[in-house]
C-alpha cells in the first residue's frame, strides 16, 4: 500500500510541476508607429511617433507599467479645411497603463488556437500629454484678420485605452526572454490643447473630446526577479 501511495504522490507532484512555469517580472520595450488625430478639424491626418515602456508583471498576463511617447500629431489642411485650419503638434506623452491578457481568463493549454492568442490583451490608464505646436494656422488666411484662439503649448490630462497582442519567445532555459508587441491605443484628452485651437463652441460646434490614436509595433526584453505561474507558458 505504501509504494502505491508514494507513486501517487510523485505523480501528483509531477503533474503540478508540469502545470507551472517561471517568468521574469519586469520588461522594457521600445517601438514606433503611426498616430492619427480626431480633433475639431475635418481632416484626420497621420503622424509618426516612437515610444519606450517599462512594465511590472504580477503574473505573465497581468501588468502595470509606465509608457513615454514622442512624435507628431497632425490634422487639418490650410487649403481644404472649411475654416483654413491646420496644425502639427510635436508632442510628448507619459502614462501609467494596466493590462490584462486573455491568458489570465481562459484555459489555453489544450487548445492550439487559444494558446496562440493567449497574448491578446486590453488595458487602460492615465497620464498627461504635453502639446507643442510646430506649425499652426493662427490667423485665418482670408484677409479678415480673425485670430483663432488657442495655445501653442499646453498640457492635457490623458486617458489611454489599449488593445493588442504580444508574442513571447522562450530562451534555452524555458523563460520568456524576448517578445514582439502590436498595440492600438486610443488616447482621450481632457482639454483643448491637442490641436492648438480653443474656439467658441458656438462658432465651431464639436462637443467631443480631442482624441488621437497610436498604432505601434515594438520589441520587449524580459528581465529581473523570477515569479511562478500556475499556468504553463508553452
Stretch-by-stretch model annotation:
Residues 62-141:
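Gram-negative (and chloroplast) outer-membrane scaffold detector with strong preference
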Amino acid at each position: 500500500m505504501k509504494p502505491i501511495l508514494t507513486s501517487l504522490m510523485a505523480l501528483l507532484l509531477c503533474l503540478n510541476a508540469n502545470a507551472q512555469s517561471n517568468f521574469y517580472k519586469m520588461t522594457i520595450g521600445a517601438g514606433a508607429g503611426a498616430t492619427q488625430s480626431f480633433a475639431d478639424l475635418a481632416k484626420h491626418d497621420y503622424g509618426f511617433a516612437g515610444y519606450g515602456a517599462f512594465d511590472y508583471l504580477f503574473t505573465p498576463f497581468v501588468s502595470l507599467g509606465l509608457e513615454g511617447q514622442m512624435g507628431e500629431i497632425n490634422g487639418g489642411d490650410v487649403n481644404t479645411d472649411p475654416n483654413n485650419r491646420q496644425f502639427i503638434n510635436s508632442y510628448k506623452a507619459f502614462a501609467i497603463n494596466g493590462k490584462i491578457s486573455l491568458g489570465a481568463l481562459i484555459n489555453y493549454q489544450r487548445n492550439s488556437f487559444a494558446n496562440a492568442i493567449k497574448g491578446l490583451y486590453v488595458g487602460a490608464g492615465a497620464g498627461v500629454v504635453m502639446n507643442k505646436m510646430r506649425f499652426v494656422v493662427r490667423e485665418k488666411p482670408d484677409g479678415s484678420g480673425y485670430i483663432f484662439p488657442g495655445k501653442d503649448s499646453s498640457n492635457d490630462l490623458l486617458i489611454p485605452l489599449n488593445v493588442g497582442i504580444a508574442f513571447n519567445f522562450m530562451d534555452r532555459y524555458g523563460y520568456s526572454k524576448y517578445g514582439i508587441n502590436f498595440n492600438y491605443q486610443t488616447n482621450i484628452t481632457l482639454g483643448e490643447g491637442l490641436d492648438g485651437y480653443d474656439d467658441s463652441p458656438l462658432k465651431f460646434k464639436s462637443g467631443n473630446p480631442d482624441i488621437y490614436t497610436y498604432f505601434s509595433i515594438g520589441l520587449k526584453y524580459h528581465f529581473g526577479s523570477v515569479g511562478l505561474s500556475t499556468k504553463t507558458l508553452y
